[in-house]
């Protein structure tokens, strides 16, 4: 192995050992602790599946429903089946391809000390080597947010919601053990078709409800 590659490999080895000692608290129980879901779906509603409880064509006037809904954000809501996002469901992003998602270098990566002596030597890494190590760490630990359109069915309006999910097929930490998990979320207002049996018969109406969606992902311990 030529000297530059050997130097990079040595720094990565020492960095891995340091991170293991620093973040080992969550590591031993990685395979023993339950892993939470990275999605935030609507709580399953117990409803009669009969078509009599479905909205009729006269109940789907788009102008009236938009008036009831108020804020209609077409980036996340759609009445008709939309085209899928290019990165939807992609759980196998290449390490350095993650940089294409953009953004500033995280402060946690900038704060990593690469000047610690390696194996008793006094050599310090060059600025170029530091930058390469920072980029490698960023690409490896980066947790992009993937979007995909979800069809909620005819009893929700608009029935298509663009929901976020965290790519978690591989570990995002050095050493392995941490995965990408939801960090923040928000709520979209949509309408739900609700029918209630009254003495005078079936009473149905569109009612507003909050639909939770993930807005950011972060590399963190499981559990």
Swiss-Prot record:
Keywords: Chondrogenesis, Developmental protein, Differentiation, Disulfide bond, Glycoprotein, Secreted, Signal. It comes from the Eukaryota. One of its GO terms (biological process) is osteoblast differentiation. Glycans are attached at residue 61. Residues 1-26 form the signal peptide. It is found in: Secreted. Disulfide bonds join 143-180, 166-217, 172-219, 195-204. GO terms for cellular component: extracellular space. InterPro entries: Cystine-knot_cytokine (IPR029034), Noggin (IPR008717). Inhibitor of bone morphogenetic proteins (BMP) signaling. Belongs to the noggin family. Homodimer. This is Noggin. It comes from Takifugu rubripes (Japanese pufferfish).
């Amino acid at each position: 192995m030529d000297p530059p590659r050997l130097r990079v490999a040595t720094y990565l080895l020492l960095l891995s050992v340091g991170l293991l000692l620093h973040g080992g608290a969550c590591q031993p129980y990685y395979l023993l602790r339950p892993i939470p879901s990275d999605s935030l779906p609507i709580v399953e509603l117990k409803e009669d599946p009969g078509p009599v409880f479905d909205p009729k064509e006269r109940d789907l006037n788009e102008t009236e429903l938009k008036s009831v809904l108020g804020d209609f954000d077409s980036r996340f809501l759609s009445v008709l089946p939309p085209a899928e996002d290019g990165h939807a469901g992609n759980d196998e992003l290449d390490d350095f391809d993650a940089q294409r998602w953009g953004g500033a270098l995280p402060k946690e990566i900038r704060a990593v000390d690469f000047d610690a002596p390696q194996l008793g030597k006094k050599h310090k890494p060059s600025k170029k080597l530091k930058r390469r190590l920072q980029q490698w760490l960023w690409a490896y630990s980066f947790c992009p947010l993937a979007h995909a359109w979800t069809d909620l069915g005819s009893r929700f309006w608009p029935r298509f919601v663009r929901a976020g999910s965290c790519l978690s097929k591989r570990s995002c930490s050095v050493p392995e053990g941490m995965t990408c998990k939801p960090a923040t979320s928000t709520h979209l207002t949509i309408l739900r078709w609700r029918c209630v049996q009254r003495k005078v018969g079936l009473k149905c109406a569109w009612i507003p409800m909050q639909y939770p969606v993930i807005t950011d992902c972060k590399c963190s311990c499981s559990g």
